[in-house]
Every structure is written in C-alpha cells, then in structure tokens.
C-alpha cells in the first residue's frame, strides 16, 4: 500500500505527470469544471471533503512556485484566504485574478487535473503552478 499522503489514484497520477509550470486545480463544489478526463470529482456531500483538507494533502506531494486565487476571495471569503496563506510557503507567489479568468485557466493544456471538493464556501478555488524540486 502507498505510504505517502495522497491515496486517491487519480490525484496521485495527476501530480506524477506534472512538469515545471504545469497546473493542478482544487475547486469548490460549484466551480463549473470541464467534464473531461482531467476531472477528479471527490465531492460526497456538502463540505465533504472540504477544500482546505484536500489542499493540505496535495501540498505534501507537490512542489509549487505560484498559486492563483480569485480576486473576489479577499472580500467574499477572507477566512478561507487566511487558511490558504497558512499552508503556502513564503517563497510561493500569490497571484490574484478575476474569477472568470480562473474558469478559463481550467481549460488550459497546462492544467493536468481539476479536483472538485464538497466545499460550499464562495471562491474556494486555487490553481497550483508546479515548480521543480532541484
């Protein structure tokens, strides 16, 4: 059995395919993610699993250099923004973009996976940009 934190085979596979600058997204239950082979739907019910638990687990196995968040999270969900910042290392760039731009980035060929959680708080979506480990 796998010893590392991520047990979901689809998430583990997506992380293992990442190269420098590739993207992986973690989304709330309401984000309109494409229904394609990159969709990893974890949502069981409202708030299960929650966004922050999935993010924390993914970060144990993924080296990141930048994150993208919706500009709207600053006012609509400041508590979630604070929780995200606690998990992100100081050397990781945080870029705020319009929520509409985030929706378009989900379709990027650089995006290797769209993880849907059961999160039901507004703008609980993040795009993780991969870094190298050397």
Curated annotation (Swiss-Prot):
One of its GO terms (molecular function) is D-ribose pyranase activity. Pathway: Carbohydrate metabolism; D-ribose degradation; D-ribose 5-phosphate from beta-D-ribopyranose: step 1/2. It is an enzyme of class 5 (isomerase). It comes from the Bacteria. GO terms for cellular component: cytosol. The keyword ATP-binding does not apply. Its EC number is 5.4.99.62. Substrate binds at residues 28, 99, 123-125. GO terms for biological process: D-ribose catabolic process. Coiled coil: none annotated. It catalyses: beta-D-ribopyranose = beta-D-ribofuranose. The active site is at 20 (proton donor). It is found in: Cytoplasm. Keywords: Carbohydrate metabolism, Cytoplasm, Isomerase. Homodecamer. Catalyzes the interconversion of beta-pyran and beta-furan forms of D-ribose. Belongs to the RbsD / FucU family. RbsD subfamily. This is D-ribose pyranase. It comes from Staphylococcus epidermidis (strain ATCC 35984 / DSM 28319 / BCRC 17069 / CCUG 31568 / BM 3577 / RP62A). The gene is rbsD.
